[in-house]
């Protein structure tokens, strides 16, 4: 039994998929699957899970039983209200982050205590992929990379006479992703730094081979 705190205003009025929306969607699906009771934006049960620690999450946090609060994974370490947690570790039970590298960052760069990794679950695809039937060659998945880099990928595929479809982060819905994964031979991943990489893991869950043009640094620092 758990209390969840988040704001649907992050994605209200659109069916486009983003990381924050996917975290909440997959979390709720997991709780339903395991038949775990939960409340949303009220302290009904003993344990508090502040999924989105934005300004609204900070205000909600101040009115909760602090020692029962787990905070994350949607927490931006540069926010002023987040910095207060660095000097007041008694205000939370644990900070959770979606991967080992973000845990190392939270501890070594920002000085947080009691940090745990918690990657959200990835649902199995409802549309089954047939490796013998493809309608096009490649999905280009683009997130936080330059227009020039995207154009370079397009030029490369065109030179090889490969057909493709493009998914740009924030401009597609879940049905788009699932349908393309069921019809493509492979994915060209043109991605920035990821904390967990939910969309990437969803593509992998469809058994789609991924070619990744990697990055070696986090440009937000």
Please describe what each predicted stretch is:
Residues 1-61:
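N-terminal pre-catalytic "stem/leader" segment of glycosyltransferase-like enzymes
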Residues 14-16, 22-23, 120-177:
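Conserved catalytic-core segment of nucleotide-activated headgroup transferases in glycan assembly
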Residues 48-80, 96:
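Active-site proximal beta-strand in glycosyltransferases
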Residues 84-93:
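A conserved, positively charged/aromatic
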Residues 93-104, 112-126:
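Donor nucleotide-sugar binding/catalytic pocket of nucleotide-sugar-dependent glycosyltransferases
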Residues 179-184:
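Short alpha-helical donor nucleotide-sugar binding micro-motif in glycosyltransferases
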Residues 192:
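Aromatic "clamp/platform" in nucleotide-sugar-dependent glycosyltransferases that forms part
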Residues 196-221:
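Catalytic binding pocket for nucleotide-activated donors in carbohydrate/polymer assembly enzymes
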């Amino acid at each position: 039994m758990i209390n969840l705190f988040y704001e649907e205003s992050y994605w209200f009025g659109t069916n486009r998929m983003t990381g924050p929306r996917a975290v909440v969607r997959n979390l709720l699906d997991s709780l339903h699957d395991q038949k775990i009771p939960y409340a949303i934006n009220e302290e009904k049960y003993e344990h508090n899970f502040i999924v989105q620690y934005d300004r609204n999450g900070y205000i909600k946090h101040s009115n909760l039983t602090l020692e029962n609060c787990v905070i994350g994974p949607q927490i931006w370490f540069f926010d002023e209200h987040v910095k207060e947690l660095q000097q007041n570790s008694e205000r939370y039970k644990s900070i959770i982050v979606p991967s080992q590298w973000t845990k190392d960052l939270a501890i070594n760069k920002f000085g947080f205590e009691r940090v745990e990794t918690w990657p959200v679950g990835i649902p199995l695809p409802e549309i089954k992929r047939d490796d013998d039937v493809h309608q096009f060659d490649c999905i280009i998945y683009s997130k936080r990379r330059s227009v020039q880099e995207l154009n370079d990928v397009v030029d490369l595929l065109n030179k090889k006479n490969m057909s493709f479809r493009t998914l740009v982060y924030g401009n597609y819905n879940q049905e788009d992703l699932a349908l393309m994964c069921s019809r493509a031979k492979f994915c060209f991943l043109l991605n920035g730094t990821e904390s967990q990489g939910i969309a990437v893991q969803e593509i992998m869950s469809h058994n789609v081979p991924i070619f990744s043009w990697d990055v070696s640094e986090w440009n937000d620092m």
